[in-house]
Amino acid sequence: MMTEWMNKWLMAIFCWMIFMPVPDLLAQSAKTKDDPRITLRMKEVSLPEVLSEIERQAGVTFSYESSLLKELPKISFQVKDEALTDCLTRLFESYPIVHKVSGKIVILKRRQRQVTISGFVRDQASSESLIGASVYEVASRKGSATNSYGFFSLTLPPGNIRLHASYIGYESCSFNFTELDRDTILNIELRPNARLEEVVVTASERDRLSVNNTLMGTMEFSQKTIKATPTLFGESDIVKTLQLTPGVASGTEGLAGLYVRGGDQDGNLFLIDGNPVYQINHVGGLFSAFNPEAIRNLDFFKAGFPARYGGRLSSVVDVHTKEGNMKEYHGSATIGLISGNLSLEGPIIKDRTAFQIALRRSWLDVLSAPAIAIANKVRKDGHKINLRYAFHDLNLKLNHRFSDRSRMFFSLYNGNDVLKGGGTDFSTEEEQVPYTDGTHSSLRWGNLMGTLGWTYVFNNRLFGRVSGVFSRYRSNVRSSKEYNYGVEGEDNYLSSSSETSSSTSILDMGVRSSFDYTPSTSHVIRFGGDFLMHRFRPEYNEVKAAGSGMLEFSNIGKIYTNDLLWAREAAIFGEDDWNVLPSLRLNAGIRFSLFNVERKAYTLLEPRASLRWLLRDDLSFKASYARMGQYIHLLGNSYINLPTDAWMPVTRKLKPLISDQVSAGFYYNLMRSYSFSVEGYYKWMKNLLDYKDGYSFLPGTAAWEEKMAVGKGRSYGVEFLARKESGRTTGWIGYTLSWSDRRFDEIDNGRRFPARYDNRHKLNIVVSHKLSEKVELTAAWTYTSGNRMTLSLESYEQAGTLTISNQYKMNNWWEPSGEVVDLYTRRNNYQMPAYHRLDLGLNIYRPKKKGRMGIWNISIYNVYSRMNPFMVYKSDNWERTNNLVPGSSSPYNGKTKPCFKLIGIMPIIPSISYTYKF
């Protein structure tokens, strides 16, 4: 009953959000309804003849200079029962004429020739492009925001023009043009604002504060914001930062999981400079593969997706790396408990070519090696252990500017993890026959990615980007065993060895292109296309075995292998960000994609639309619809994203995943630097995959397609966000109320069941406060309703009799003596306890000579040491379900209720790191 009531309440809110602006829309359209209706069917006539007929039907008079209509060609014009305003707009759109209706008078004037001002907005200190900077004309308040490469284009009437450029965290500046009558290139350099006092956020920056643009479910994070978030082991992490935003579930305690608006782990598209990343985890998910020292900023989309993005259902994380300083050399070095970080940037050719390199490496293996060596040395029991884990990241960016119009860049990312472990038993001095018995295992995984891109300003209104991309992910699990007994050459000598290897990989190669065309200040048109060649090796297993001496043999073979799968993916897209009216802005786009695999071609048409209705200067209503398609899936053994999980494409049997999402919400700005939003959403998903009951992704069993069930899902909810982006105190408060469920015909008898991360409530509070120029305090508190999992809540004894446990008198536990069979009644039938945690961080800045800086970071993860459950396991003891006391005459029904134990692994964890900037 409670769930039904909450569903109705949520839908009522959602409907209210959608229909709230209707009165305003009706009021706006009232003028159109009052307009006279015009019907014309005229062929090869002069424009004055058309105007005379309109005057007759509408009862209006046209006022214009006689020279305005001279030497205009004859036209054919046809409308049927159309409002006067719309009729005139269509009539004059192909003429250099503008009109204005004033009562019964229609004034015609010559359209002024337009001039275009275009260029780049850059950081004055480094010449790096500033993404999302605001450039606007003061008098008309017409403006533009820079694209992902810092480019802007403004088309304005000629004359006296005053431009204003601004970007949060930088000093704004203005430019005056007197009687400007030609297209002009203007490259703007903004100076970083080092002052502590509040940065003024102008009305033109409303785009960045989400009131004026059409974007929904979108957040932008700078490197500074990411670093200001309290960290685990002193390691800043973009995924951990995203986990603190509304609508995002983190999954398992401490790991870099991302489950967005009821989606799955594989529904997130991670991009580094436009190139997809398939495995984002280090240390099993404690850290992500994104080195914060290499990041310039990132855009996070979870609704209202622009048409240029595709390939995943749930979200897009678009990461832009640093371009490199073209003026001076700068760098930083960080020492933490888990890893070290070194970055360097600077000019190769001043103001022409720059580089940026960032290297991160863990030293868990370095720190643990002496301890393991000492332990092995002091042990006298004939046993040695070996354990090693290490990871590294390398980010490299080369950036060359041929001219103000042309630029080329190369971006490289390489990240690898290595985990090795094992042990060896060997004979001691007391034993007569020497022997060794060793077992060793290793797990390796990593990404290698490269992007070669070229950007070019074709003219003042057209900007283009073309890039070639390469991306490879692979993992390998290897296990070996070696046994030697006796002395080689003697009769009793024998030796055997075996090795098994399992690997998975995915490789992409392709071309991406995108273009920004700005015909006027009312339109920004983006279009382009992608082509990718995929190569999948979902599973390759090999075994080797050999023996000598008394055990002579040799064998090499495959045990279960999926063949290589090749697939081709292509897409074209187009979108128009259009200021329809001063208060109405529309972003309409479409994406068409094709995926060819196993001689089967799938096509998807993905329409996208977002609108913004400006109710006041500081308040807007938005609504959006987006269809997303996904052609690849991630298959694994658990809910933790393991390196051994395999990416698989759609097949002849399994169709592409599709989601349709509608969103609506209000956005409000207060006192320049505060922004508030409330969004409601409803998302339908189909062709989802999950394992059938009793199956998992294990080698040597049925083909993977046969293990999968195909079903549907839905998620809906409301998200609230309050954010402050400037001043001494910054941060956000976010709350999410959401539902998410699934339905598969072959799972749970076709009944709906809650999704794994169906977290009803989520609350996040993130605060950063500058106590002074040298001290910054950060805090983050999160609360989430418990995750769900499938457990056997009852067990059945097949044979034997129930006996009272010796522990019964203390614990009221029963212990079955026969074979016990687990009973699974529903999928995801158990909800874990709520999750909550407080993290604190302290940054101490120590200025040095010549602009150098030392930064101490002290972090405390899980301040009050809440042992949030990481896993649940079943106890060996059982509780009887019929609640009979010993000695009761009632027969035992054969069912028992198990006792469960919750395991938490992340207590309070203090950490410290030191960064030296030069």
Short names for language-model regions:
Residues 338-361, 377-422, 442-464, 470, ...:
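Transmembrane beta-barrel wall of Gram-negative outer-membrane proteins
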Residues 366, 774, 783-809, 818, ...:
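C-terminal beta-signal and adjacent terminal beta-strands/loops
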Residues 682-684, 702, 706-793:
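Gram-negative outer-membrane beta-barrel transporters
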Residues 504, 508-510, 560-565, 571, ...:
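Outer membrane beta-barrel strand-and-loop segments of large Gram-negative receptors
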Residues 142, 171, 200-306, 316, ...:
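Periplasmic N-terminal accessory/gating domains of Gram-negative outer-membrane beta-barrel systems
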Residues 474, 542, 617-662, 682-705, ...:
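Surface-exposed extracellular loop regions of Gram-negative outer-membrane beta-barrel proteins
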